[in-house]
Amino acid sequence: MSQETYELKAEARERVGKGSARELRRNGLIPAVIYGDKQAPIAIAINTNEVTKRIHAGGFMTTVATIEVDGKKHKVLPKDYQLDPVRDFTLHVDFLRVSGNTQVTVEIPVHFINEAKSPGLKVGGVLNIVRHEVEVHCPADAIPEFFNIDLSGKKIGDSIHISEVTLPKSVTPVIDRDFTIATIVAPAGGVDESAAEAEGEAEA
């Protein structure tokens, strides 16, 4: 499951546009919008520090939140945010309204485990990561936090495909082909022969 949900307080904003957005930012607020679920969009302002903390904590785009706007609570999933390219602060956030049966498309990070059990890595092979994240369809209330990719037994030349990853029943990849997530390749200087021999003897 994704990270534990959290709550943010916001205020509805009547004025929109660049001038209004600049004024909000000067006052420590970020302009944002809540949309979707067949309801009218709501322009809101949220606390800059609270949102920045959530973004930097990780999992921001895959964690469902509750935003309270003038006493009414909205269950949402962040869909996009804009950062200032120079000063690296948040300029705007888009939130999608969700309910328990809402299907969402999210990018889930992959974690590699059991590196020490990979013969290819033991002899100096390099893990070449093709995809750091996998885009999937899933219910809003069942977003995985990450996918574990097991490297046990993987040798130089081996590839890890999405078909080797155990996905929850309600989660399906956006791409329907059996795409590659990572490969184990020989190092630029070649394989350490003594290490390879030792590994071969250990397997014998």
UniProtKB/Swiss-Prot annotation:
Short name of any one Pfam family annotated for the protein: Ribosomal_L25p
UniProt keyword Acetylation, yes or no: no
GO cellular component, one term: cytosolic large ribosomal subunit
GO biological process: translation
Single annotated GO MF: 5S rRNA binding
Keywords of the record: Ribonucleoprotein, Ribosomal protein, RNA-binding, rRNA-binding
InterPro entries: Rbsml_bL25/Gln-tRNA_synth_N, Ribosomal_bL25/Gln-tRNA_synth, Ribosomal_bL25_b-dom, Ribosomal_bL25_C, Ribosomal_bL25_long, Ribosomal_L25_dom, Ribosomal_uL5_bac-type
Protein family: Belongs to the bacterial ribosomal protein bL25 family. CTC subfamily.
Primary role: This is one of the proteins that binds to the 5S RNA in the ribosome where it forms part of the central protuberance.
Subunit structure, interactors included: Part of the 50S ribosomal subunit; part of the 5S rRNA/L5/L18/L25 subcomplex. Contacts the 5S rRNA. Binds to the 5S rRNA independently of L5 and L18.
Protein name, as recorded: Large ribosomal subunit protein bL25
Organism name: Rhizobium etli (strain ATCC 51251 / DSM 11541 / JCM 21823 / NBRC 15573 / CFN 42)
Gene field: rplY
